[in-house]
From Swiss-Prot:
Disruption phenotype: Larval lethality. Embryos lacking maternal and zygotic wol activity show segmentation, dorso-ventral patterning and gastrulation defects. As a result, germband elongation does not proceed normally and mesoderm invagination is disturbed. In these embryos, protein glycosylation is reduced by 25 percent, the ER tubules are smooth and the unfolded protein response (UPR), a transcriptional response which up-regulates genes that enable cells to cope with misfolded, endoplasmic reticulum-retained proteins, is activated. The chain crosses the membrane at residues 8-28. Gene3D superfamilies: Spore Coat Polysaccharide Biosynthesis Protein SpsA, Chain A. It comes from Drosophila melanogaster. This is Dolichyl-phosphate beta-glucosyltransferase. It is found in: Endoplasmic reticulum membrane.
Length: 326
């Protein structure tokens, strides 16, 4: 009997080992090690509403010419975008008036929107000027991570913030992130990330969410910890501030373009040993979310596993390390 059990265990383990090796070989064969960042010609320019001319975006590889770039990824956000931009621009204008050397730009990235998102954003560009508000219109939907990346690659700031279009995070909390980032990285050439966090609100969220959604939330947090990021409690808050140097390293190495992109960014940051600070921010849930709890979190769980597997077997590599080695 014991002999049969041992043989059965041997066959099971052998089958699992063969399956694991097959998956690893398939992943290595079908996956490119570095991101292939393609950009349509029309995505290289923005419209200046005053001159009615198209202007070429700068590059993230250029030296900075502003203090702050705010990247706002937007997919079908004609309803929620105005209130977010109103709060954002009012805060930035007030900060600019009180601090003359504080200059900024807001880049709204329409991620293949089918509604009036582009028209709404262009209205703000016309009102405030293309020096302050620019609209990057992606030809096809890339996903939130892809939209953020395209905005980052087009930015002029010493520091770069991405902020969700729903306005769930109170924009004046930017000051908290700025203070935290300066402690990590006094200059834009230094590395650092200040990460807006809702972790302090978790108990309140549990009190108001259904039991099912609470289970999903804890399950997702566990998967993030297991497969990817262990030093940051809230990886998904859409309010993160990077130095220009750090943005170059991370967004040229990013593979995931959809919802789990935040996790890969922070996974990369941990592996590159970049300084990070998690900062509590004010956050309110806004109606109109594009996420459907079960299916979106199932997709993110799959993405987390694939992030882990691909880096583990060497199918994905970090582009910034490749550049350094050259």
């Amino acid at each position: 009997m014991w002999t049969c059990l041992c043989q059965l265990c041997f066959y099971l383990l052998s089958t699992l080992a063969v399956a694991a090796l097959s998956i690893a070989a398939l992943v290595l064969y079908k996956t490119k090690p570095y991101p292939n960042i393609k950009r349509h010609k029309d995505e290289e320019t923005f419209l200046d509403p005053h001159t009615i001319k198209t202007v070429t975006f700068p590059s993230l590889e250029d030296s900075p010419s502003l203090e702050l770039s705010v990247i706002v990824p937007a997919y079908n956000e004609e309803q929620r975008l105005p209130s977010m931009l109103d709060e954002c621009l009012a805060f930035l204008e007030q900060k600019s008036a009180g601090t003359p050397n504080f200059t900024y730009e807001v880049i709204v990235v329409s991620d293949g929107s089918q509604d009036a998102t582009v028209s709404v954003a262009l209205g703000y560009s016309k009102k405030h000027g293309a020096e302050k508000v620019r609209v990057l219109e992606l030809i096809e939907n890339r996903g939130k991570g892809g939209a953020v990346r395209m905005g980052m690659l087009s930015a002029r700031g010493r520091n770069l913030l991405f902020a969700d279009a729903d306005g769930a995070t109170k924009f004046p909390d930017y000051d908290k992130l700025e203070v935290a980032l300066k402690q990590l990285a006094p200059e834009w050439r230094d590395d650092g990330i200040a990460i807006g966090s809702r972790a302090h609100l978790e108990n309140d969220a549990i009190a108001t969410r259904s039991f099912f959604r609470t289970i999903l939330m804890h399950g997702f947090h566990f998967l993030v910890w297991l497969f990817a990021v262990r030093s940051i409690r809230d990886t998904q808050c859409g309010f993160k501030l990077f130095t220009r140097t750090t943005a170059r390293k991370l967004f040229t190495s990013l593979h995931v373009e959809r919802w789990a992109f935040d996790v890969e960014l922070l996974y990369l940051a941990e592996n590159l040993k970049l300084p990070m600070s998690e900062v509590a921010v004010r956050w309110t849930e806004i109606d109109g979310s594009k996420l459907t709890p079960f299916w979106s979190w199932l997709q993110m769980g799959r993405d987390l596993f694939m992030i882990w597997v691909r880096y583990l077997v060497g199918a994905w590599r970090i582009a910034s390390i490749q550049k350094k080695e050259k």
